[in-house]
């Protein structure tokens, strides 16, 4: 028993592995059951050989009870006749004889064997035309001779008792002899050459008429034999009843769980085909004992296998027996190379049998069919053998226990010894082996399911002592505790078996595994035993035929019943049509879309807020309906049904199907339960749907063989309850396709958010390493983004935005993402409409017709406008009438509802009459829904004369939602973007990507619409823009801002441009009016930066006009332009006279002279709002600064930032200015007096100002003056005692070691406030640099340090490296032009490895060279905080750069590496390509070289 548990545990482990999963999970789509598959599975051989034996034994009865229908060899299953027979023929597929479409599943390119795709008329193999005519008569004569031979060999085998009963339903004969002949002729004409097949039919009919008399004689003989056998059985029943009365009192417990095939035979009195291998009297006695559930002490062991029908039980073929020699010859023919395996059988869909030459069947198809059959048989044999082995292990153990119990009880039961002694003596040689009495019931029901019932009765008697092996121990008497322990162990093994088969179910088909697992627990099959030892083993999916769909199932129930003298094991199996465990040929296909549908089994259920979609518990609560089955007697029709995403299935139907039956069958294939929301449509030639009436028959609806249909929603309304996960998925699919193809036009922001959800559903959660630009190609990207949003943008730009939104999605499962998708899409104004392209009935010209879109919705119709985007909506209450015309349709509306794009009577031309009817049909259907809703609310009359199909749908939907005219994510900013991209596309101009990025950042920022974020800054500096590039921006702004919002519409106002930065674009001077045109268009701009745009005196006047027209400008930067003094004076004069809100003026490098300073003096005096004044790097002398000084005195309270650097002002006037600052109350906090000719004496006055109480300076720049060491030391002393300065620049002023020490001491104090320190080119020695490094180890305030252009030594570099390991505040570090070689840099980089606070480091103009590459790469791969590093002019060539990039890892945090200005003149194309490849590899880093 422990070995069984170990084997089952190993089997469970193997089933959980990926290898087993890949081997088992193959989906076979098969069309009909085959007797061949069962025989192959049970015997491990080919069913073709068995059919030859059956033909030989039973061909004489082939048409027994057939009546007139025997002329076509069609069995007549007439219940009034006592006999029936199913003749088995060797058949080949006819698919090879007819050309098929390349898209058809029957095409030879498909991997599925063609012969299994449809059930076709039977084909008998013949060698040539001459022999085909005589094969029928030969076959009949041969079968008769074989039958007689089998009769003579009846006694050759006494061990096996084989009953073959072919189950078939009663079918009334619908065709007379003539009809059957016509059916056979039609089959011949359809599938073969007409002349040849008619000749064969004539010969065939002639032969059939000649043997009719023979068959009648055989029928009479069989009838007599059946009556004799029935009489004998009735006598035996009487004897058995008497025996039962005697044995019933002595039996301790009697079980009622045995399936008695003979009892069924006696009750039904039906036909059967029995081939007996043992004497009939012994077999009947054995069955009588089974019937009364008791057996004598020493019964014989027997094995019987019977194939019977519920309404036939008469022995056919005179009780013929297959001899051992005959069986050996049959088994020998089952070898792999046997020629009998060259064909396969398909159930006939017509009555007749058609004979064709084998040579006419395509060899390619036959080879493919044979190869697939062998592979399937090997796979099935390996799987089934393991299951049977485990089943037998448990059965043998239980039988041994029962044998011991029965042996102990036999001593008390002596009355039955006499009755069974003879039988026991006859079979004493078989006592050591277990004989099986099985009856295999094969039954073809209306669901076309084959039910196989195997009753295994094992009767074990204690062997005589002389025959007991020496090594066998004496049976031990088990105590009740031991019996209970063994029972518990058996139950544990049974549960493990259930887990094994449940795992097999899930591996075979995940769609049915859940339902199968639930139903397996409830029992089923033929056994009704209540014993605890009963176990149910689902060999395949167990399907409840009463309430669920007739999916392929194979059910086995093993019941073990222990009595005083008998052990009976009953196994009932239900063989399905499409059982994957059986050797049935099928098409190995790719996984369909339904295999990947997420049914949303999550702990936290989600409920859609709009479509009332909900889950119950862990799953959707649904019930499956039963689908109609294919009628094998009717012509088969293949139907190609696709979903809206172009995934499809091919199903087989018959002519008796209605459209509703087709929907149910297709839904069963998909696992769909709530079918009431979906309909079938046929796509017409004009691209629109022709909806099929579900109550019509398929031929009336126009469904033909290989018709292509679409399965989708017709009436798109909000369902009251949608509880089927597959229905949710189909809703999602149709909406998603409508969004992508533009049927539901929506805003770009809405579209991208829906696309991000779709991407999440398709590819899962965001992965920053996987989901990057380039993940999707253009074709795949078009399946997510509507085509009208591509414009001239690259795929990388679109994917970058898509992945950004994808990263914001927080969903627990894909089903939740689908529900969010439906909720968001429900806000689209055109949600749920069916769109039709029509044309205006009134043409504007004889050639051009105006295209319009007419959309039918649940509450009215929408008609697209002529002059602009959008729709005019008319509710059904507004519409007076609508009708179909010869050219299309006509719609009449009241005069009050007329819009500029519509008229009182609107005529539209359609592409076809069917399209017009389709539109009217949808409108009428939606009106019925509205009338029903009004009637329910009590405000309308009941609906009269409503279509039956619509009446069934009325209670399923909610009332129409309130229609909105606008998308909630439609915004002014998006409209500006679309207008700009449209202009660029029309004029074939590349859009400015930086502008698009800035717009998308606002649109896609999380919570942007909820928080009402606005687009306020247009920052386009340093892009080498031209005037024409800006003209599109100006035009788009004009169109956007001038858009008038109609009544009932809404738009998010998120476009409010306040700042325009066009600096450092010198090419704009070619057309200076264009940048100014933007300002004139958008009157909200108050901050204007036009620095270095090439503005000359010609462009001054438009700027002056803007200043005069828009007096609210607060910031004006026009520095570094080619405006001379006259132009500056004109601008300043305009500001002085018209602007009263100016705060910032920038006139650096504008050639401003002393005369211009007079205007600045007046401007400062009159305008009290100026806070920032920059007049640096001009031609101002002492006289000009004197005017400015006077103006500052009058505006001392408002001016905060003064930059007069780069002007030749002598030291005396500056000392006077500093003294005034020290003695006056001013607001100046930023003072830049760099490069103004200051001398060392200025240092003392500056020290006094810095230590005074009136000093509020926060930023002081005295760079590039001639202060000397003494003047600089005085400035440092003033800074030491100052508590306000946070930014200090002493660049290009010599600092002594003592001054440096004093500065470091003040910065080491806890009260230090300086955060930015610039000591560039200050002549610092090695000791001073070491001192600064030691200071930085203690300082907690400095974030920016510039030590560039100071010569570093090894010791100072090592000190800097040590400092970097300890410092935790420094963020920007400048070490440019510091004579740092490879060794010095290595010391600094070693300290930088473990520093996580520095974000930027500048190592430009240092001779690092090739030797420093490894240390650089090592630092970059190790550091976790560095974002920017500059290595300009560092003696690196192309090979060095390539080597550096190769050593870099892809997951480093750095963002920018600047390698420009290195010697790359002699770089080869190979190295350049290699560098580009590395840059692609390091795509997350902006590498500049």
Swiss-Prot record:
Residue spans of the LRR repeats: 1017-1040, 1053-1075, 1087-1110, 1111-1133, 1167-1191, 1196-1219, 1254-1278, 1282-1306, 1339-1362, 1367-1391, 1395-1418, 1428-1450, 1451-1474
Ranges of residues in domain FERM: 637-934
GO cellular component terms, semicolon-separated: cytoplasm; cytoskeleton; plasma membrane
Pfam families named in the record: FERM_M, FERM_N
Keywords on record: Coiled coil, Leucine-rich repeat, Repeat
Protein's GO biological process: cell-cell adhesion
Biased composition (Basic residues): 163-172
Region span, Disordered: 59-86, 103-197, 252-271, 277-312, 396-435, 459-479, 508-569
Record field: compositional bias (Low complexity): 131-153, 181-195, 277-287, 421-435, 556-569
Extent of Polar residues compositional bias: 59-79, 103-118, 303-312, 545-555
Ranges in a coiled coil: 202-289, 356-383
Entries under SMART domains matching the protein: B41, LRR_RI
Gene3D superfamilies according to UniProt: 1.20.80.10, Phosphatidylinositol 3-kinase Catalytic Subunit, Chain A, domain 1 (3.10.20.90), Ribonuclease Inhibitor (3.80.10.10)
Name of the protein in its database record: FERM domain-containing protein C
Record organism: Dictyostelium discoideum
Organism ancestry: Eukaryota, Amoebozoa, Evosea, Eumycetozoa, Dictyostelia
């Amino acid at each position: 028993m422990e070995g069984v548990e170990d084997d089952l545990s190993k089997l469970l482990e193997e089933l959980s592995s990926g290898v087993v999963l890949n081997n088992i999970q193959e989906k076979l789509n098969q069309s009909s059951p085959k007797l061949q598959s069962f025989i192959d599975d049970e015997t491990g051989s080919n069913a073709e050989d068995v059919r030859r034996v059956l033909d030989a034994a039973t061909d004489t009865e082939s048409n027994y009870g057939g009546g007139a229908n025997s002329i076509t060899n069609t069995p007549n299953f007439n219940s009034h006749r006592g006999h029936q027979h199913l003749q088995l023929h060797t058949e080949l597929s006819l698919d090879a004889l007819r050309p098929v479409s390349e898209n058809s599943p029957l095409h030879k390119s498909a991997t599925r064997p063609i012969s299994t795709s449809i059930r076709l008329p039977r084909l008998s193999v013949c060698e040539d035309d001459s022999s085909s005519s005589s094969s029928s008569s030969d076959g009949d004569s041969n079968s008769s001779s074989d039958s007689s031979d089998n009769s003579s060999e009846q006694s050759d085998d006494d061990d096996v008792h084989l009953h073959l009963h072919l189950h078939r339903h009663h079918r009334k004969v619908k065709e007379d002899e003539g009809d059957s002949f016509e059916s056979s002729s039609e089959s011949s004409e359809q599938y073969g050459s007409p002349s040849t097949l008619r000749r064969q039919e004539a010969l065939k009919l002639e032969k059939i008429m000649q043997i009719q008399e023979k068959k009648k004689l055989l029928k009479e003989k069989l009838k007599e034999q059946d009556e004799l056998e029935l009489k004998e059985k009735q006598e035996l029943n009487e004897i058995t009843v008497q025996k039962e009365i005697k044995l019933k009192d002595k039996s301790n417990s009697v079980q009622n769980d045995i399936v008695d095939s003979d009892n069924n035979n006696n009750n039904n009195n039906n036909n059967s085909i029995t081939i007996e291998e043992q004497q009939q009297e012994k077999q009947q006695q054995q069955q009588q004992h089974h019937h009364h559930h008791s057996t004598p002490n020493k019964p014989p062991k027997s094995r019987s296998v019977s194939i019977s029908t519920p309404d036939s039980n008469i022995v056919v073929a005179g009780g013929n027996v297959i001899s051992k020699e005959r069986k050996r010859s049959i088994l020998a023919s089952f070898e792999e190379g046997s020629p009998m395996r060259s064909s396969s059988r398909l159930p006939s869909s017509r009555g007749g049998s058609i004979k064709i030459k084998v040579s006419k069947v395509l060899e390619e198809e036959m080879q493919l069919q044979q190869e697939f059959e062998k592979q399937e048989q090997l796979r099935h044999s390996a799987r089934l053998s393991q299951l049977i082995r485990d089943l037998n292990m448990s059965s043998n153990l239980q039988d041994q226990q029962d044998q011991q119990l029965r042996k102990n009880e036999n001593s008390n039961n002596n009355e039955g010894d006499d009755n069974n002694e003879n039988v026991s003596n006859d079979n004493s040689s078989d006592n050591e082996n277990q004989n099986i009495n099985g009856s295999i019931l094969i039954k073809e029901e209306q669901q076309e399911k084959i039910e196989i019932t195997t009753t295994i009765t094992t009767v074990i008697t204690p062997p005589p002592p002389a025959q007991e092996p020496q090594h066998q121990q004496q049976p031990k008497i088990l105590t009740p505790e031991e019996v209970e322990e063994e029972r518990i162990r058996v139950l544990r093994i049974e549960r493990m078996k259930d887990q094994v088969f449940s795992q097999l179910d899930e591996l075979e088909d995940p769609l049915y595994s859940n339902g199968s697992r639930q139903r397996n627990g409830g029992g089923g099959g033929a056994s009704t035993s209540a014993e605890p030892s009963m176990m149910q083993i689902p060999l395949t999916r167990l399907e409840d035929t009463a309430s669920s769909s007739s999916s392929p199932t194979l059910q086995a129930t093993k019941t073990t019943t222990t009595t005083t003298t008998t052990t009976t094991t009953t196994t009932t199996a239900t063989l399905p049509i499409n059982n994957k465990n059986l050797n049935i040929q099928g098409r190995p296909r790719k996984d369909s879309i339904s295999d990947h549908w997420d049914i949303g089994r999550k702990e936290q259920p989600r409920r859609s807020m709009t479509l009332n979609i909900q889950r119950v518990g862990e799953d959707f609560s649904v019930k499956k309906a039963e689908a109609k089955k294919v009628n094998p007697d009717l012509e088969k029709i293949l139907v190609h049904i696709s979903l809206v995403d172009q995934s499809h299935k091919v199903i087989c139907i018959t002519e008796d199907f209605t459209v509703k039956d087709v929907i149910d069958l297709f839904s069963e294939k998909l696992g769909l339960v709530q079918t009431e929301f979906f309909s079938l449509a046929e796509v017409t030639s004009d691209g629109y749907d022709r909806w099929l009436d579900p109550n019509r028959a398929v031929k009336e609806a126009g469904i033909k063989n290989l018709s292509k249909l679409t399965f989708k929603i017709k009436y798109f309304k909000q369902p009251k309850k949608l509880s089927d996960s597959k229905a949710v998925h189909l809703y999602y699919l149709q909406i998603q396709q409508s969004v992508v193809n533009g049927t539901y036009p929506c805003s770009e922001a809405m579209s991208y958010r829906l696309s991000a959800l779709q991407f999440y559903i398709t590819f899962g959660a965001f992965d920053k390493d996987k989901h990057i630009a380039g993940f999707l190609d253009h074709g795949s990207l078009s399946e997510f983004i509507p085509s009208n949003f591509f414009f001239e943008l690259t795929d990388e730009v679109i994917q970058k935005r898509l992945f950004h939104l994808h990263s914001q999605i927080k969903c627990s499962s894909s089903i939740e993402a689908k529900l969010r998708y439906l909720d968001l899409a429900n806000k689209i104004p055109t949600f749920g409409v069916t769109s039709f392209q029509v044309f205006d009935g009134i043409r504007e010209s004889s050639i051009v017709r105006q295209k319009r879109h007419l959309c039918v919705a649940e509450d009215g119709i929408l008609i697209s406008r002529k002059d602009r985007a959008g729709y005019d909506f008319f509710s059904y209450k507004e519409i007076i009438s609508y009708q179909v015309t010869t050219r299309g349709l006509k719609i009449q509306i009241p005069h009050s509802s007329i819009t500029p794009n519509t008229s009182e009577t609107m005529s539209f031309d359609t592409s076809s009459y069917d399209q017009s009817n389709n539109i009217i049909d949808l409108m009428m259907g939606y009106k019925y829904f509205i009338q029903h809703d009004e009637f329910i609310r009590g405000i309308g009359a009941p609906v009269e004369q409503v279509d039956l199909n619509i009446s069934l749908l009325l209670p399923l939907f909610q009332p129409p939602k309130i229609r909105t005219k606008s998308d909630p994510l439609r915004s002014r900013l998006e409209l500006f973007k679309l207008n700009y991209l449209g202009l660029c596309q029309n004029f074939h101009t590349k859009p400015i990507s930086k502008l698009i990025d800035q717009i998308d950042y606002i649109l896609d920022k999380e919570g942007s619409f909820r928080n009402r974020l606005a687009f306020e800054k247009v920052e386009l500096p340093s892009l080498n823009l031209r005037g024409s590039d800006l003209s599109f921006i100006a035009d788009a702004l004009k169109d956007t801002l001038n858009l008038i919002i109609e009544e009932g519409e809404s738009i998010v106002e998120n476009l409010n441009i306040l700042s325009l930065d066009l600096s450092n674009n010198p090419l704009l001077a070619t057309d200076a009016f264009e940048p100014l045109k933007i300002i004139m268009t958008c009157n909200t701009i108050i901050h204007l930066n036009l620095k270095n745009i090439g503005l000359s005196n010609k462009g001054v006047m438009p700027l002056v006009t803007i200043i005069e027209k828009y007096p609210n400008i607060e910031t004006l930067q026009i520095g570094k332009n080619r405006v001379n003094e006259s132009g500056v004076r004109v601008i300043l004069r305009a500001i002085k006279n018209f602007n009263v809100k100016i705060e910032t003026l920038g006139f650096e490098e504008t050639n401003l002279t002393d005369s211009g300073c007079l205007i600045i003096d007046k401007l400062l005096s009159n305008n009290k709002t100026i806070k920032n004044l920059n007049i640096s790097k001009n031609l101002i002398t002492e006289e000009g600064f004197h005017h400015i000084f006077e103006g500052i005195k009058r505006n001392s309270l408002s001016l905060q930032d003064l930059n007069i650097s780069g002007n030749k002002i002598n030291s005396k006037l500056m000392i006077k200015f500093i003294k005034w600052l020290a003695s006056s109350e001013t607001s100046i906090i930023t003072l830049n007096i760099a490069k103004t000719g200051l001398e060392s004496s200025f240092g003392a006055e500056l020290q006094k100002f810095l230590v005074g109480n009136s000093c509020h300076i926060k930023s002081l720049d005295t760079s590039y003056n001639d202060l000397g060491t003494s003047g600089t030391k005085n400035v440092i002393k003033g800074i030491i005692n100052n508590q306000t300065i946070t930014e200090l620049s002493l660049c290009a002023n010599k600092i002594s070691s003592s001054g440096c020490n004093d500065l470091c001491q003040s910065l080491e104090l806890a009260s230090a406030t300086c955060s930015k320190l610039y000591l560039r080119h200050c002549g610092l020695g090695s000791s001073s640099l070491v001192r600064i490094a030691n200071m930085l180890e203690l300082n907690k305030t400095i974030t920016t340090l510039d030590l560039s252009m100071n010569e570093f030594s090894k010791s100072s570099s090592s000190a800097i490296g040590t400092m970097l390991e300890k410092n935790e505040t420094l963020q920007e570090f400048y070490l440019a032009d510091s004579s740092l070689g490879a060794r010095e840099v290595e010391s600094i980089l070693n300290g930088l490895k473990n520093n996580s606070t520095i974000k930027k480091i500048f190592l430009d103009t240092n001779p690092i060279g090739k030797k420093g590459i490894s240390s650089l790469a090592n630092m970059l791969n190790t550091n976790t905080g560095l974002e920017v590093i500059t290595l300009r002019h560092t003696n690196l060539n192309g090979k060095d750069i390539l080597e550096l990039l190769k050593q870099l890892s892809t997951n480093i945090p750095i963002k920018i590496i600047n390698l420009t200005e290195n010697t790359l003149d002699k770089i080869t194309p190979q190295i350049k390509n290699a560098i580009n490849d590395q840059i692609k590899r390091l795509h997350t880093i902006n590498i500049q070289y």
